[in-house]
């Protein structure tokens, strides 16, 4: 048994891909018999049915929104440094074998611990977030893992280290196919014969939802009985709402507040397909994999690590060039017109995720990267 800690100030205060990865890996490692600790900021976010082998420690921090805006990276570094100032003594007292860092902004952790601390550090990459000085600080990172092959190349280009690829995962028992929820559709005002596309995630520019709105207004989609459900919040939401009005799409686009991660499967049960038109390099795309695990066909951008999730052979979903509203509209029309194809793609996507991308598999790969014994046995 190993003592493993995850350090991420955001994991107890917000939802997102990195936060999901931390909680799910913590759960998989705890079920495998390891002693797990999670160090986050003061906040109440926890997964439902937290495994008893996981201890959560929270500490005060200065939220990035309260830091002078001289750059988002500066704000996030200050946010994490303020958390470390309060958390480091409790962390050092834990005598952990390994600590997992999720952002380069935390690379200073090995440098601020008491002399003689034996904890080794692993960087679990899910993107880039590089900053001046990170190469120097990275010298005390002992192990490197990445969310995809694409992400591994990004990390190697920056730090000249080759990470082990562990991939992210999906809770396939939770994100499972279900009977279409017409009650939820009725609550949303969606007719039974309407093809409902959906996106769930943070509304930031690089997610490309402006492209999805423009695709819906393309000639190929104007005479199709479709609607787009956008679930989430973020700085781009007002801009997207304004674009919806400008394009005359107010009757075809629904904005929904963010939902807890545990309620996402029910939401996917009400939709016909997922649309994820990223215009920035996503390392993996957990939300895409979750939709696929629910047997939903997906349309996503051919960018970053997304093709590793969806596959290139068009059996599980369709890949389109990033920032191409016309190509996205054609793909949406293709799925809207072919319900049988939607079913086939959904079933193939579910099989792909179950075969390649579960959290138990991710945990086994992480343990191997740390040089620890992997035990696939499920521990109650």
Language-model regions: role of each:
Residues 7-13, 28-75:
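N-terminal strand-loop element at the rim of the active site
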Residues 176-190:
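A short helix/loop element that forms part of the nucleotide-sugar donor recognition site in Leloir-type
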Residues 241-259:
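Nucleotide-activated donor-binding/catalytic signature segment of Leloir-type glycosyltransferases, i.e.
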Residues 297-300:
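Short hydrophobic beta-strand element within catalytic cores of glycosyltransferases
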């Amino acid at each position: 048994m190993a003592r493993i800690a995850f350090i991420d100030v955001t994991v107890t205060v917000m939802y997102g891909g990195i936060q999901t990865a931390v909680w799910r890996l913590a759960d998989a490692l705890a079920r495998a018999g390891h002693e797990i600790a999670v160090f986050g900021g003061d906040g109440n976010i926890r997964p439902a049915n937290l495994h008893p082998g996981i201890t959560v420690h929270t500490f005060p921090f200065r939220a990035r929104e309260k830091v002078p805006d001289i750059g988002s990276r500066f704000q996030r570094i200050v946010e994490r440094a303020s958390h470390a100032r309060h958390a480091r003594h409790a962390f050092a007292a834990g005598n952990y074998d390994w600590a997992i860092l999720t952002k380069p902004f935390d690379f200073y952790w090995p440098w601020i611990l008491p002399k003689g601390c034996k904890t080794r550090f692993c960087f679990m990459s899910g993107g880039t977030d590089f900053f001046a000085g990170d190469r120097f600080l990275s010298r005390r990172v002992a192990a490197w893992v990445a969310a995809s092959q694409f992400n591994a190349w990004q990390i190697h280009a920056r730090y000249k280290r080759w990470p082990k690829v562990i991939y992210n995962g999906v809770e396939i028992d939770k994100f499972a196919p279900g009977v279409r929820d017409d009650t939820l559709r009725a609550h949303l005002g969606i007719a039974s014969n309407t093809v409902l596309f959906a996106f769930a995630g943070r509304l930031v520019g690089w997610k490309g939802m402006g492209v999805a709105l423009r695709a819906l207004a393309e000639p190929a989609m104007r005479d199709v009985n479709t609607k787009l459900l956008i679930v989430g919040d973020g700085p781009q939401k007002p801009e997207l709402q304004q674009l919806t009005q400008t394009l005359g799409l107010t009757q075809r686009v629904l904005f929904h507040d963010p939902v807890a991660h545990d309620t996402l499967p029910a939401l996917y049960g009400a939709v016909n397909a997922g649309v994820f038109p990223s215009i920035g390099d996503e390392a993996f795309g957990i939300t895409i994999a979750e939709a696929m695990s629910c047997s939903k066909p997906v349309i996503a951008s051919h960018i970053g690590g997304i093709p590793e999730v969806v596959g290139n052979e068009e059996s599980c979903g369709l890949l389109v060039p990033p920032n191409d509203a016309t190509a996205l509209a054609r793909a949406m029309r293709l799925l809207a017109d072919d319900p049988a194809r939607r079913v086939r793609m959904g079933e193939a996507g579910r099989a792909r995720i179950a075969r390649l991308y579960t959290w138990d598999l991710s945990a086994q790969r992480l343990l191997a990267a740390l040089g620890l014994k992997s035990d696939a046995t499920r521990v109650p």
